[in-house]
C-alpha cells in the first residue's frame, strides 16, 4: 500500500441480484472517493486472512462521493467473485467483522468521458461492459437536469449485447431515459437504447434485436414484429460517421476487436474516434 494510493475501508451497503450470477454491489466508503466517469477502482477483499484484489469499472456517478457501485458477473473458479456470493462473506462485509473486510484503491483508467467532444456518442457494451457507461450516463443526466441552459445538446446511442434478455442489466433505467427522449423531442440529452441478445432460441419471449453487440453495425432489412428498434438500428448503421459520432467500446475483447475492424473500414481512427476498454476474466 503506497502513500499515494491508500486503501479506503468500505462496507457493503446492498447486493441486488439482477439475474442468476449477475448482481449489483453498492459499497459505502469511510471517506470521499473522487473519479471520472469511465474509470475503475480495485476492490480488495480480505476473508479469513487471505486478501484478493480485483479491478471493477465504477457504475455510480461521481456525485456519489462516498458510495461505489459495481456490476459484477459471477465467474466460476474466479479469483474473487465466488466469494462475493458466499453468505458468510456477505454478512461479514455488511457488518465489518474481524474476519472479513473490503477496501478500495484507485481510481485508475483512461477510458473516460470526454465532455469537450461535441459529437454524438455510441456506447457499445457486451455483458458487464455496460458498467462504465452507466456512470457516464448518470453523470450526463445529472448535468443535463441541473443546468439545462448550459448543456450542449447531444445524443447517446446505448448498444448492449448479452446472451439472454434477463442479463440486460439496468434495462429499466435506460428505457426510462429513452422513453423520456421519445416524449420530449427537444430534450438536450437524447438517449437511444438498442439491447440485443445472441441466444434467442432459449429466450422465446424476446421480440427485440438479435445478434451480438457488433451486429448492430451490420446492414439488414430483417423485420422483427414491428419493433421500431430495427429501424433505429438501420439508421444508426447507415448514419455512423467519424465526423458526427465517437464510439466507446467496453466488454469482451472479441466484440471490441470486431467492432473496431468494422469502424476502421468506415474511416474511424482508434483513440481519436474509437475509445476502448477490454474486459478479461
List the model feature ranges, each with a label.
Residues 1-20:
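Short, low-complexity N-terminal leaders and the immediately following helix N-cap/first helix
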Residues 44, 139-143, 262, 266:
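Active-site catalytic microenvironments for nucleophilic, acid-base chemistry
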Residues 58, 134-149:
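Histidine-anchored nucleotide/phosphate-binding helix
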Residues 62, 114-117, 150-152, 239-241:
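Short, flexible hinge/linker loops that cap or flank conserved catalytic cores
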Residues 121-124, 248:
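Conserved beta-strand elements of the Class I
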Amino acid at each position: 500500500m503506497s502513500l499515494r494510493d491508500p486503501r479506503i475501508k468500505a462496507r457493503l451497503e446492498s447486493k441486488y441480484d439482477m439475474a442468476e450470477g449477475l448482481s449489483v454491489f453498492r459499497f459505502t466508503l469511510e471517506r470521499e472517493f473522487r473519479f471520472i466517469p469511465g474509470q475503475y477502482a480495485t476492490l480488495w477483499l480480505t476473508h479469513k486472512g487471505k486478501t484478493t484484489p480485483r479491478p471493477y469499472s465504477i457504475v455510480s456517478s461521481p456525485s456519489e462521493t462516498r458510495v461505489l457501485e459495481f456490476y459484477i458477473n459471477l465467474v466460476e473458479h474466479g479469483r474473487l467473485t465466488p466469494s462475493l456470493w458466499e453468505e458468510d462473506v456477505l454478512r461479514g462485509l455488511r457488518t465489518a467483522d474481524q474476519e472479513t473486510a473490503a477496501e478500495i484503491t484507485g481510481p485508475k483508467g483512461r477510458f473516460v468521458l470526454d465532455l469537450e467532444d461535441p459529437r454524438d456518442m455510441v456506447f457499445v457494451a457486451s455483458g458487464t461492459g455496460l458498467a462504465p457507461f452507466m456512470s457516464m450516463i448518470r453523470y450526463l443526466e445529472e448535468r443535463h437536469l441541473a443546468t439545462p441552459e448550459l448543456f450542449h445538446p447531444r445524443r447517446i446511442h446505448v448498444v448492449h449485447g448479452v446472451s439472454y434478455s434477463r442479463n440486460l442489466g439496468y434495462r429499466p433505467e435506460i428505457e426510462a431515459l429513452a422513453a423520456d427522449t421519445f416524449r420530449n423531442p427537444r430534450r438536450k440529452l437524447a438517449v437511444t437504447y438498442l439491447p440485443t441478445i445472441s441466444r434467442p432460441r432459449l429466450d422465446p419471449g424476446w421480440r427485440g434485436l438479435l445478434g451480438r453487440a457488433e451486429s448492430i453495425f451490420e446492414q439488414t432489412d430483417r423485420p422483427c414484429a414491428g419493433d421500431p428498434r430495427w429501424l433505429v438500428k438501420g439508421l444508426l448503421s447507415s448514419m455512423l460517421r467519424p465526423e458526427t459520432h465517437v464510439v466507446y467500446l467496453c466488454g469482451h475483447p472479441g466484440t471490441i476487436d470486431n467492432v473496431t475492424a468494422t469502424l476502421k473500414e468506415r474511416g474511424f481512427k482508434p483513440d481519436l474516434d474509437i475509445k476502448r476498454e477490454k474486459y478479461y476474466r
